[in-house]
Each structure stands twice: as structure tokens, then as C-alpha cells.
């Protein structure tokens, strides 16, 4: 199996550390994020990075117990890039000086101008005399460490870009990973080129290596996979099936809360097209019965999550002799489980997942996607031959339409919601907008309104259209449809869907709102 060169990102707590990894993965460089407290001398020997990046972070080098890397990292003889707090750490550790931010803090857009000398990591920069960057710092470097030179300055950061070219140590006070630093990607490209990375970490290579790993892990044992019809579980299932064939059985739990025709699409694709052993468990009566009279969104989510585990266990037992459970865990999930802070956070919404299943069922985990980001999963899906129409689908929540139907759920409401959602998505596709939007759906509101159709009075439901743009789902903006589009869509829904006589458009961003209504 090919051994790829690895880049280590030491995380000091920045909110945008994952973006560093994303930028490097886009360059076909394999990298991992590890919190600073886990990076010991023994870890570094085992990981053997070809280069290291220090992330930014909210701390001050003056704080008691301030996050620091092990001293031996500077003796490894590999290129190091320090970003924001990472720059301050480098200067602090190597003999420079950092001062507290009194009137010199910079937050937001700034412009860096070049200093004397040429630096290979800045190839392609300063062609127009200065570069826009994104700053977010309180403290600042006041004296650079021995061996370092200044290669770029900003009004409040005289050492915005510094380097010790002989040791291949580079440090910047800004964040090259964010889109607000337009040439940040070029800086990363130059850094990995200087470090000697070949850019050989592709989805084609990942596919071959993942298949070999799955075969080595599973042997001749049986694997069960909870198939939701979403991108993650689908790509995991196709990859595992390619590795071990009919040793894999998928269990598709239909809770009666799916979109129009969705269950049939999943069964057709995986049973008929991919010829996978598939148990289609239609448990809609069980789920809808348990949700009868329930209006609290947290109770809805927890009821669905509990029943899902019960149903999955029951049908998985029918497989008999399974040793492994496959899950579509992604790299952001892994990062968060070993996060910088490890501290508790407020539960905004309970997540519907099968996290408790392995312990309950005594199964070992197969997680073939745990090294990938979402966009890489989609690329792997294309590599595996899944159709773009499936790979490019918008995210769909585990509890399904239950959380797009605020208030009590009934079969009648669900059918109205399915029909309205199908019309809305059809409109978006007809206008060529689907791929511009992160997520779009209809929420059926627990409100009836008076209307007039023909010569008669109506008293039907109102619905809300939702469409947002986002990069990762953590923040989102509403999509700016034209009034013509909204008017045309509202007319179609009211004319084609019996039970709705009023259509609204939700223009709330996240934050303060969430993408889903519940």
C-alpha cells in the first residue's frame, strides 16, 4: 500500500483550523489535525510529518498554561508554517518578543505590503504591490527571533510575514486559509511545494487503499450497514461492497418521514443497480404511531433516534453472525471528538445518529470515510460511479420530515408536505439553481389561513420555503431568489398541492436561526 507523505497541523484552538486542512486536501496533500496537548515527542516520531503547520488560536502566549508545541518540533528539520497565534508561538519559543495588544489589534480586512528580499513561499504575491489578508489578533510580534527576516508588513503588524529561509521556518500574522485572503491558497501551494510534497493523495488512490484496509480489517466476517439514502452512508456502502461483496448487508429503515419517492429510489439503486443484499424495513406505522400527539421538537428527535436503534437491532439480528457495523463517520466528526478544548457545549439540537449501536450490539466499527471531508466524500462517490444526481443531493436530516412539520405530525400533513417539497425542488432544478444552493426544503406550518379559490373560501395550511447557501452548514445565508421565481413557485404550490393556500419565504440567516425549523 502506498505510504503518502503527511503534513501535521497542530491545533491551538482556532475556529478555522479545519479550513487549513481543506486547503491542503485541495492540493492533494494528506494532512491531519491534532490538538497541541496530544503532540508529544513520541507522537512526532510515530507520525513523522514532512512539514508542520501551527494553527491560530484565541490564547495569549502570556497566559498561564498557554498552548505551546513541544520544543523538539523545531529540531526535526522539516518546514514549519506558523499562522496568527502560531506565529507568536514561534517567536516566543525561538527567542523573539511578543507584546500584548494595546491599540495594535487587527480584526478583519487588512493589506500587507512587501519588504526587501524574495521569498519562495510568496511566489505569485504582491504582483499589484499589496495583498488583501484577513487579520484576527490582539497580541503582536514586536521583535523577531534570531535568523528571521521581515518579508511583509501591515499598518498594525510590522512583522506580518517573517521567515528564517535557512531553516524553512515561515510565520504570518494573518489567516491564509480563509476566503478573505484571496491569495491564501497560493501561499499554501508554495509551502507544500517547498516541503517536497508530490500531491499524490487523490480519491482514486484513496479508493484503492480503503478497499485494501477494509479487506484486511474484515477478513471473511459479515458487515451490516445502516443505509439512510444520504450521501455518507451510501458512499460507505458502495465502497465496502466493492471491497467484500455480499459479506455486506445493508439495512434501510423507512420511518415514514422520507421525501416523495425516496424509499423507492434507495431500494432501486442499491438492490437492483448495485445488487447489494438489502433489508428494506418499512416501519412507518411504528414511527408515526409513536409520534402521534408529539409536538415538542426535542421529543420528536429523541423518539425517532430511540426507535431507529430498536428497529435497526431487530433487523440486523436477521442477518446473523455479523461482526462489524459500518458507519459513515467523517473527518470533522473525528476532529470534534478529540477537540482542542474538549469542553462541554450547549445542545442546540439532539443529533439523530447510531452512535450507541456498536456498544449495544457488541459490534466492531468499520468507518472507511473517517479521514475525509464532505466534499471529498462526494468526490469519492463520483470515483465509485454513483450518479451526480445522487452525490450532489442536498443534506437531509435523520428525523426527516418530522422536523419540517412543526407541531403535531399526521399522515395528511406529511403527504401535503411531500407534494409541496417536490414542486419546490422541481422549480429549483428547472431554473438551474439546485447546485448553487446548500439546502432547500418546504416547512409546513401549524397554521391555517383563510384564502379564496374560484368563488369559494378556503381554510388551508401555510408553508414556508427555505433555501440557504453555506460552505459547511455551520453558518448560512438565505438564497436571494428573484421575486419572479418566488411568485411562480408559490402559484405552482397553491395550484398543484391540495391543502396549502399561502406560501412564505424564510429569509433568516444562521445564526441567529438554524437551517431546519426544528
UniProtKB/Swiss-Prot annotation:
Residues 201-393 form the GMPS ATP-PPase domain. The keyword Signal does not apply. Keywords: ATP-binding, Glutamine amidotransferase, GMP biosynthesis, Ligase, Nucleotide-binding, Purine biosynthesis. CDD domains: GATase1_GMP_Synthase (cd01742), GMP_synthase_C (cd01997). InterPro entries: Class_I_gatase-like, GATASE, GMP_synth_C, GMP_synth_GATase, GMP_synthase, GMPS_ATP_PPase_dom, NAD/GMP_synthase, Rossmann-like_a/b/a_fold. It catalyses: XMP + L-glutamine + ATP + H2O = GMP + L-glutamate + AMP + diphosphate + 2 H(+). GO terms for cellular component: cytosol. Residues 6-200 form the Glutamine amidotransferase type-1 domain. The keyword ATP-binding applies. Its EC number is 6.3.5.2. ATP binds at residues 228-234. It is an enzyme of class 6 (ligase). Pathway: Purine metabolism; GMP biosynthesis; GMP from XMP (L-Gln route): step 1/1. Disulfide bonds: none annotated. It comes from the Bacteria. The active site is at 84 (nucleophile), 175, 177. GO terms for molecular function: ATP binding; GMP synthase activity. Homodimer. Catalyzes the synthesis of GMP from XMP. This is GMP synthase [glutamine-hydrolyzing].
Amino acid at each position: 500500500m502506498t505510504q503518502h507523505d503527511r503534513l501535521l497541523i497542530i491545533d491551538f484552538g482556532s475556529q478555522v483550523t479545519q479550513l487549513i486542512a481543506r486547503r491542503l486536501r485541495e492540493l492533494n496533500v494528506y494532512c491531519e489535525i491534532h490538538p497541541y496537548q496530544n503532540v508529544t515527542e513520541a507522537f512526532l516520531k510515530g507520525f513523522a510529518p514532512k512539514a508542520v503547520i501551527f494553527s491560530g488560536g484565541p490564547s495569549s502566549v502570556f497566559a498561564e498554561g498557554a498552548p505551546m508545541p513541544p520544543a523538539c518540533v523545531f529540531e526535526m528539520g522539516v518546514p514549519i508554517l506558523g499562522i496568527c497565534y502560531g506565529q507568536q508561538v514561534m517567536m516566543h519559543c525561538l527567542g523573539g518578543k511578543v507584546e500584548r495588544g494595546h491599540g495594535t489589534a487587527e480584526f478583519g480586512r487588512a493589506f500587507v505590503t512587501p519588504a526587501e528580499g524574495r521569498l519562495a513561499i510568496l511566489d505569485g504575491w504582491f504582483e499589484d504591490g499589496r495583498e488583501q489578508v484577513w487579520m484576527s489578533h490582539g497580541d503582536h510580534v514586536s521583535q523577531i527571533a534570531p535568523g528571521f527576516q521581515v518579508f511583509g508588513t501591515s499598518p498594525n503588524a510590522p512583522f506580518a510575514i517573517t521567515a528564517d529561509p535557512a531553516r524553512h521556518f515561515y510565520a504570518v500574522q494573518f489567516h491564509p486559509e480563509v476566503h478573505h485572503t484571496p491569495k491564501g491558497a497560493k501561499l499554501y501551494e508554495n509551502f507544500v511545494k517547498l516541503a517536497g510534497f508530490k500531491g499524490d493523495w487523490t480519491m482514486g488512490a484513496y479508493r484503492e487503499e480503503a478497499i485494501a484496509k477494509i479487506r484486511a480489517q474484515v477478513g471473511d466476517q459479515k458487515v451490516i450497514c445502516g443505509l439512510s439514502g444520504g450521501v455518507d452512508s451510501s458512499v460507505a456502502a458502495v465502497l465496502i461492497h466493492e471491497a467484500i461483496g455480499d459479506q455486506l448487508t445493508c439495512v434501510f429503515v423507512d420511518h415514514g418521514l422520507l421525501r416523495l419517492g425516496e424509499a423507492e429510489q434507495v431500494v432501486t439503486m442499491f438492490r437492483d443497480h448495485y445488487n447489494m443484499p438489502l433489508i428494506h424495513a418499512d416501519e412507518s406505522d411504528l414511527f408515526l404511531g409513536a409520534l402521534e400527539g408529539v409536538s415538542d421538537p426535542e421529543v420528536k428527535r429523541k423518539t425517532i433516534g430511540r426507535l431507529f436503534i430498536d428497529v435497526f437491532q431487530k433487523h440486523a439480528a436477521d442477518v446473523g453472525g455479523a461482526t462489524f457495523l459500518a458507519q459513515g463517520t467523517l473527518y470533522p466528526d473525528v476532529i470534534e471528538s478529540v477537540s482542542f478544548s474538549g469542553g462541554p457545549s450547549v445542545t442546540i439540537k439532539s443529533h439523530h445518529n447510531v452512535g450507541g449501536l456498536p456498544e449495544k450490539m457488541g459490534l466492531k466499527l468499520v468507518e472507511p470515510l473517517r479521514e475525509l471531508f464532505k466534499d471529498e466524500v462526494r468526490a469519492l462517490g463520483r470515483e465509485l460511479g454513483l450518479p451526480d444526481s445522487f452525490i450532489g443531493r442536498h443534506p437531509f436530516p435523520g428525523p426527516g420530515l418530522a422536523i419540517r412539520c412543526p407541531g403535531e405530525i399526521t399522515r395528511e400533513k406529511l403527504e401535503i408536505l411531500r407534494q409541496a417539497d417536490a414542486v419546490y425542488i422541481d422549480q429549483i432544478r428547472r431554473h438551474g439553481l439546485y447546485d448553487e444552493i446548500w439546502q432547500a426544503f418546504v416547512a409546513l406550518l401549524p397554521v391555517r389561513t383563510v384564502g379564496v379559490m374560484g368563488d369559494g373560501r378556503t381554510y388551508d395550511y401555510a408553508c414556508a420555503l427555505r433555501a440557504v447557501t453555506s460552505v459547511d452548514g455551520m453558518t448560512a445565508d438565505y438564497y436571494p431568489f428573484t421575486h419572479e421565481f418566488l411568485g411562480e413557485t408559490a402559484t405552482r404550490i397553491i395550484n398543484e398541492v391540495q391543502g396549502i393556500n399561502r406560501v412564505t419565504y424564510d429569509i433568516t440567516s444562521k445564526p441567529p436561526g438554524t437551517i431546519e425549523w426544528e
